[in-house]
Design a protein with these regions (language model features):
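Membrane-embedded alpha-helical bundles of multi-pass transporters/translocases
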Residues: 1-260
């Protein structure tokens, strides 16, 4: 993989900004906007329809399933990316596919099937979209973050890249948690706000433009210098074994209880 030039590092560090912003908005605001519970004022702007449009019990179960998938999907995603065979390498196609599907599911999440109260159909619809979103968000972001060690020339560049990324993370959270409530105060509905932010997903295209990989098609003359199968003597872990380890992890179970 071609290494980044020094001036390209801040651009590459910004690539994750949009998708991570959408992830914060859907998990913090849009999911809560499906029901009125917990909102003391401006309910008409904090929610989609100033009423509960999902069957709360059913949607809670489906939301917990999406949280479970959020943890489990990392193993098959890593396996998928590692074994991807395309003329454009592994990371760029994975980032593009993940971003496109993630963005479509995010936009669809802003359009309920109906505004009927306690709707079972809405519950299933939003539960499925949420699961699709977290799965393909993980695909895109893991593929992106997986390039950090490969695309930098040395430890100093890697530290610079991660530090700038952390700064953009702080900006992203500041906008999500401080600015969005201001928009709500101006009378803008959370669904509209969510749609306004959707184009930010395109920031990840910066990474797609900067990543330069060789073909991973069978028989390709060139091979990745970072191909771990050439330098790692450890036995590979199967996808099933990886899922089993994840399910048996106490840390993962605690995370699931908190976020589920």
């Amino acid at each position: 993989m071609r290494k980044l030039k020094r001036w390209q590092i801040p651009l590459f560090a910004f690539a994750h900004f949009g998708p991570c912003m959408l992830s914060t908005i859907i998990s913090v605001y849009l999911v809560d906007a499906l029901q009125v519970a917990g909102f003391g004022s401006d309910v008409e702007n904090w929610t989609f329809a100033a009423k509960t449009i999902v069957a709360v019990g059913l949607f809670s179960v489906l939301k917990a399933i999406s949280s479970l998938m959020d943890g489990l999907v990392e193993v098959p995603v890593a396996t998928f990316v590692q074994n991807l065979k395309t003329p454009w390498g592994r990371k760029r196609p994975a980032i593009l596919v993940g971003t496109i599907v993630m963005t479509l599911s995010y936009v669809l999440f802003c359009f309920p099937l109906s505004l009927e109260e306690n709707s079972v159909a809405n519950s299933i619809y939003f539960g499925v979209l949420l699961t699709i979103f977290v799965s393909f968000f993980t695909l895109a972001i893991n593929a992106l973050f997986g390039t950090y060690a490969e695309i930098t020339e040395n430890d100093n560049d890697r530290i610079l890249l991660t530090n700038i990324k952390a700064a953009f993370d702080t900006i992203q959270y500041s906008i999500a948690y401080a600015l969005i409530p201001v928009f709500i105060g101006f009378g803008i509905n959370i669904r509209e706000i969510g749609l306004y932010f959707a184009p930010l997903a395109a920031t990840i295209l910066i990474a797609v433009a900067l990543i330069k990989e060789d073909s991973t098609m069978p028989g390709a003359v060139k091979k990745y210098a970072d191909d771990t199968t050439n330098v790692d003597d450890d036995e590979p872990v199967s996808m099933l074994e990886g899922v089993k380890w994840t399910l048996n992890s106490k840390a993962f179970r605690a995370w699931l209880v908190i976020h589920g």
